[in-house]
Amino acid sequence: MPASVYVSFDAPEGVPATPRRLHAALSAILDLPPGISPARAAKFPTLAHRPPHDAGGVKPYSLGELCHSESTFGVEVRFLDDRLVDTLDAWLSWGGVMRLGAGTEDDAVLIAREGQVIAQESWEELAQRDKDTAWEVRLVTPTTFSSKGNHVPSLSPATIATSLQQRWWTWNRRLAPPRIDRHAMASVLATQDFTRSSMVSLAMPRNAGQGRLSSRRIPAHEGHLRISGIEGAEATQVFSRLMALSAYTNVGSHTSFGMGVIDAVAA
């Protein structure tokens, strides 16, 4: 069951909270511990649902919105599998200490004050969310898409929908919307594009095993979109369901760097 949790932390001033570092800190909490294989973890209910740290593809958790104040730092964590909420809750019960930084003595140490489930819907409920026809879509973090290893320069409702449909298909195939018909979606959805292109540094170390140097930069989108569809059209209904799912996951590629967080509000 998809869910969203807000965690507030006691934090020092000037927390180095980049999306990439936050995602890395989350993975240390939610992924399988090093040395435990998925086959071994499958024998234990508390571990079976946790993803391998080095698994390719999209993780069943992601960053959401962030908020800052003088002494408090807040993070929204989105889940496609609410069993991981129990994992997060267990971590909170043990003190909820999170280290952020580059793995040095200068790392910031955050202490969780509380965690609260702020949204939760069943897959059946999401499948019925097909009545919305207009959305304001804000790109909370830079967002990029790729296909077969190549960057996709355009940003369209169909591109966003395809990414979300793939996530739904992975985590609940029975209720997932059908494969996106790009032509049908383009014919019924109108878009006002207020995004801009930016270059984002992946800052990947040379030993990451992906053939990229630390100076590797990729193009991404920032800004917002206004999308509206024809009421009653099947493609609009499919897009409505997928926009509902976007509250519990991210979109696009390079999500392990904290990219692809969107906020879609139905108008």
List the predicted regions and their residue ranges.
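RNA-interacting cores
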Residues: 1-267
